[in-house]
From Swiss-Prot:
The record marks 344-345 as: Cleavage. InterPro entries: D1/D2 (IPR055266), Photo_II_D1/D2_sf (IPR036854), Photo_RC_L/M (IPR000484), Photo_RC_L/M_CS (IPR055265), PSII_D1 (IPR005867). The D1/D2 heterodimer binds P680, chlorophylls that are the primary electron donor of PSII, and subsequent electron acceptors. It shares a non-heme iron and each subunit binds pheophytin, quinone, additional chlorophylls, carotenoids and lipids. D1 provides most of the ligands for the Mn4-Ca-O5 cluster of the oxygen-evolving complex (OEC). There is also a Cl(-1) ion associated with D1 and D2, which is required for oxygen evolution. The PSII complex binds additional chlorophylls, carotenoids and specific lipids. Disulfide bonds: none annotated. GO terms for molecular function: chlorophyll binding; electron transporter, transferring electrons within the cyclic electron transport pathway of photosynthesis activity; iron ion binding; oxidoreductase activity, acting on diphenols and related substances as donors, oxygen as acceptor; oxygen evolving activity. The modification Phosphothreonine is found at residue 2. This is Photosystem II protein D1. The gene is psbA. Pheophytin a binds at residue 126. The record marks 161 as: Tyrosine radical intermediate. It is a multi-pass membrane protein. Chlorophyll a PD1 binds at residue 198. Pfam families: Photo_RC (PF00124).
Length: 353
């Protein structure tokens, strides 16, 4: 008998690396998107923490009036923020090596641009990693599609809006009070409350919260009883068991009687598709609204739209909101310009008698 022995070629280091990166047996899946995601998110997180604690004041408006945002410069967790890159930089790419010194880079708000660009790249890679893992496990791609909603929203406020406005200084500050300041200024300049895409986003977020609470409470309440009436229903179950613990037919019947028959789902897949699609579509529309308002396609303007027979204005809520917008705009960047942009754009009255 003749035996043929073949030498098995040892796998190259690159081959072993590829297999490890794409293995679904790892405790945490890395994937090719993860190769880019890990360093970008680590960079963004590290710089954010350091800057939030110790970054010096930033000349956000480009008028030599620095604004303090870090903890060591007098802020607390609520008031602290990473101050956006200076208006003097505009939309220029501003890495450390473009500045004359690190002090200049910090003064002009370089950390903000570094954090935002690394963060956006990182979350986009996280979305790609979700798709990649789903693909390798033979799943459908809808997890990544759902995650695209917050990715689109973050991209809108951190990248698209600054591009439309012409400067990273108009981006959203990275902090609690900074976020609220961004929202107030956005309302003052773009009347976002009167934009239909924002209204769809509000319906998506609040509606999604309501539907999630309704679904969770229904599932928790419609248990398949495995015990007698003298025992707790909880005694009939163990954590992580394979058998179903609730009856969707019972939940459907309860909800149908609570509202009306066709207000409830009797199909689990249809129900969960609805729960995913409602907030995702709403947030997509909000991101689209921010992206259009970035280029000054603003919310509806119904100011002074109701007048009496004498031509006198009868104020509506639109006029009240407009008055509030002007007040907020007066307070915004109060040292950068003397008048709100809406007032400054009006032609001056003639002084010739």
């Amino acid at each position: 008998m003749t035996a043929i022995l073949e030498r098995r070629e040892s796998e190259s280091l690159w081959g072993r690396f590829c297999n490890w990166i794409t293995s679904t047996e790892n405790r945490l899946y890395i994937g090719w998107f993860g190769v880019l995601m890990i360093p970008t998110l680590l960079t963004a997180t590290s710089v954010f923490i350091i800057a939030f604690i110790a970054a010096p004041p930033v000349d956000i408006d480009g008028i030599r009036e620095p604004v303090s945002g870090s903890l060591l410069y007098g802020n607390n967790i609520i008031s602290g923020a990473i101050i956006p890159t200076s208006a003097a930089i505009g939309l220029h790419f501003y890495p450390i090596w473009e500045a004359a010194s690190v002090d200049e880079w910090l003064y002009n708000g370089g950390p903000y641009e570094l954090i935002v660009l690394h963060f956006l790249l990182g979350v986009a890679c996280y979305m790609g990693r979700e798709w990649e893992l789903s693909f390798r496990l033979g799943m459908r791609p809808w997890i990544a599609v759902a995650y695209s909603a917050p990715v689109a929203a973050a991209t809108a406020v951190f990248l698209i809006y600054p591009i439309g406005q012409g400067s990273f200084s108009d981006g959203m500050p990275l902090g609690i009070s900074g976020t609220f300041n961004f929202m107030i200024v956005f309302q003052a300049e773009h009347n976002i409350l009167m934009h239909p895409f924002h209204m769809l986003g509000v319906a998506g977020v609040f509606g999604g919260s309501l539907f999630s609470a309704m679904h969770g409470s229904l599932v928790t309440s419609s248990l398949i009883r495995e015990t007698t009436e003298n025992e707790s229903a909880n005694e009939g179950y163990r954590f992580g068991q394979e058998e179903e613990t609730y009856n969707i037919v019972a939940a459907h019947g309860y909800f149908g009687r609570l509202i009306f028959q066709y207000a409830s789902f009797n199909n689990s897949r249809s129900l969960h598709f609805f729960l995913a699609a409602w907030p995702v579509i709403g947030i997509w529309f909000t991101a689209l609204g921010i992206s259009t308002m970035a280029f000054n396609l603003n919310g509806f303007n119904f100011n002074q739209s109701v007048v009496d027979s004498q031509g006198r204005v009868i104020n509506t809520w639109a006029d009240i909101i407009n008055r509030a917008n002007l007040g907020m705009e007066v307070m915004h960047e109060r040292n950068a310009h003397n008048f709100p942009l809406d007032l400054a754009a009006v032609e001056a009255p003639s002084t010739n008698g």
